[in-house]
């Protein structure tokens, strides 16, 4: 039997990388020949977590074609966010906490989706359900995922289940969640060495919304001006992406982890979708979104509603 690859979405974030590692570890303990892989570069926040808990990043692959016959998806399900060649392999399982869209399979599968803030919260349940002890390093990585997705428990996506899971994982990992979490988020918020192309692709996801193709990228920072001072360059790079992918809209959210607000740079032929979704008027392609920190809960649903009216 060939190795089953376990991976998250393209432009991987901390939940995608660490959940792939943690779930592959669980599947191996249950007797499956599983390997965690990644579909993109590791960002600064995730690298901080990997270094802290002394775990190597998963192997990078460009496509699943020729790599595996069977795969497991974590932290995503939409095919446009998944590996190239995903249509040509058998999906055995999906473990996710996002909406279900643009997803179909030829065979039955195990699909676990829960309305929680992080895939790692679901993985903790799976470890318990199978009676498998979580190693300290895996617990630390899973904690890192919850901290990342919840912005240290401040995001509206964060549930009581996520907070409870984080406390349990922090105890196993031997760290203080608040202290460790703030340092990890700060590591991810350092954008000083990032190129413009890296900024707009670090955490970018493409969505099918009605008849429209929309990409939403997000970066965390402690000062939005670190990005806004380069706005013209950012807009030019986004325009190239819009043209190359034939997108209708590209939203680049710059989220301040200290104030919990976002600035949005909007580019594309359908800016009115954004204006309708958030009841704002763009000023030179820019809008302030007070209290908005979550792409999943505070951006995607409103844009989807506007796009399907």
Swiss-Prot record:
Residue positions binding Mn(2+) 2: 15, 75, 97, 149
Intracellular or extracellular location(s): Cytoplasm
InterPro entries the UniProt entry points to: DDH_dom (IPR001667), DHH_sf (IPR038763), DHHA2 (IPR004097), DHHA2_dom_sf (IPR038222), Mn-dep_inorganic_PyrPase (IPR022934)
SMART domains: DHHA2 (SM01131)
GO cellular component, one term: cytoplasm
EC number(s) recorded for this UniProt protein: 3.6.1.1
Catalyses which reaction(s): diphosphate + H2O = 2 phosphate + H(+)
Cofactor binding note: Binds 2 manganese ions per subunit.
Lineage top rank: taxon: Bacteria
Residues given in the record as Mn(2+) 1 binding sites: 9, 13, 75
MF terms (GO), sorted A to Z: inorganic diphosphate phosphatase activity; manganese ion binding
Keyword Transmembrane helix appears in the UniProt entry: no
Main localization of the protein described in the UniProt heading: cytoplasm
Keywords: Cytoplasm, Hydrolase, Manganese, Metal-binding
Cofactors (names): Mn(2+)
UniProt keyword annotation of Transcription regulation present: no
Similarity annotation: Belongs to the PPase class C family.
Protein name listed in UniProt: Probable manganese-dependent inorganic pyrophosphatase
């Amino acid at each position: 039997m060939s190795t089953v690859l376990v991976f998250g979405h393209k432009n991987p974030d901390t939940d995608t990388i660490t959940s792939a590692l943690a779930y592959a570890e669980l599947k191996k303990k249950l007797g499956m020949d599983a390997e965690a892989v990644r579909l993109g570069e590791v960002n600064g926040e995730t690298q901080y977590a990997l270094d802290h808990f002394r775990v190597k990043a998963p192997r990078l692959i460009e496509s699943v074609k020729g790599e595996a016959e069977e795969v497991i998806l974590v932290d995503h399900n939409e095919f446009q966010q998944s590996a190239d060649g995903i249509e040509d392999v058998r999906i055995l399982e999906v473990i996710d906490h996002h909406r279900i869209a643009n997803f179909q399979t030829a065979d039955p599968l195990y699909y676990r989706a829960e309305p929680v803030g992080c895939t790692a919260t679901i993985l903790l349940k799976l470890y318990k359900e199978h009676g498998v002890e979580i190693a300290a390093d895996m617990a630390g990585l899973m904690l890192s995922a919850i901290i990342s997705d919840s912005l240290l428990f401040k995001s509206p996506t964060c549930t009581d289940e996520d907070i409870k899971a984080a406390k349990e994982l922090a105890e196993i990992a031997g760290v203080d969640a608040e202290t460790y979490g703030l340092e990890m988020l700060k590591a991810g918020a350092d954008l000083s060495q990032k190129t413009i192309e890296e900024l707009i692709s670090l955490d970018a996801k493409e969505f099918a919304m009605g008849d429209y193709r929309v990409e939403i990228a997000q970066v965390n920072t402690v000062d939005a001006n670190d990005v806004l001072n380069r706005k013209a360059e950012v807009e030019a790079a986004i325009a190239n992406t819009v043209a190359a992918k034939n997108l209708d809209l590209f939203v680049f959210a710059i989220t301040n982890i200290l104030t919990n607000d976002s600035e949005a740079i909007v580019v594309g032929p359908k800016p009115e979708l954004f204006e309708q979704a958030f009841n704002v008027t763009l000023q030179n392609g820019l809008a302030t979104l007070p209290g908005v920190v979550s792409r999943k809960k505070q951006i995607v649903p409103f844009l989807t509603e506007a796009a399907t009216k």
